[in-house]
Design a protein with these regions (language model features):
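Cytosolic regulatory regions of ion transport systems
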Residues: 1-157
Length: 157
């Protein structure tokens, strides 16, 4: 079981928080808008903290000092970048992952050594793969390695 902080409680953040919580992790969601916590639903077992995700006091209230993983998944690249940097450099969170909205910012994230997921690129690559090959789709990239999904039609033997 891990202690996880999810910054941003929109569609992605709330779904991620619920998935992590349902998987037995201790999850705390941070969002500047208290109304966003309604996205978590009634069955969410974690905690919530209202505030800005890169504010030190907010992170401390969320349990950053015992945190194993922080996922910054707001819709703002600069906010996610700041959250990742504060969690990593000020608090030494072992694993920090950031959502990247604009693929043009990818180089900056790479230069800073921040793990990121770019939904825009993932969707574009997935659609491209389906158009070009019709057989496989890109799931994720981890450094030099890619995870791919393939569908096999065994009836065409």
């Amino acid at each position: 079981m891990s202690n996880v902080i999810v910054v941003g409680c929109g569609r992605v953040g709330s779904q991620l928080a619920n998935m992590l919580s349902d998987n037995g992790n201790n999850v705390c969601c941070i969002d500047k808008n208290a109304d966003a916590f309604a996205n978590l639903g009634r069955n969410f077992n974690g905690s919530t903290v209202q505030g800005v995700g890169f504010d030190e006091d907010v992170l401390i209230r969320a349990g950053v000092e015992e945190c194993d993983v922080l996922a910054a998944v707001t819709q703002l690249d600069n906010t996610n970048l700041m959250c990742a940097e504060v969690a990593n450099h000020l608090f030494g969170v072992p694993h920090v992952i950031s959502r990247l909205y604009n693929p043009d910012h990818e180089r900056a994230y790479m230069q800073l050594g921040i793990d990121y997921v770019c939904g825009t690129s993932l969707v574009a690559e997935d659609v491209f793969s389906k158009i070009v090959s019709g057989h496989g789709s890109h799931i994720d990239t981890f450094g030099e390695f890619e995870v791919l999904r393939f569908t096999l039609d065994l009836s065409r033997r």
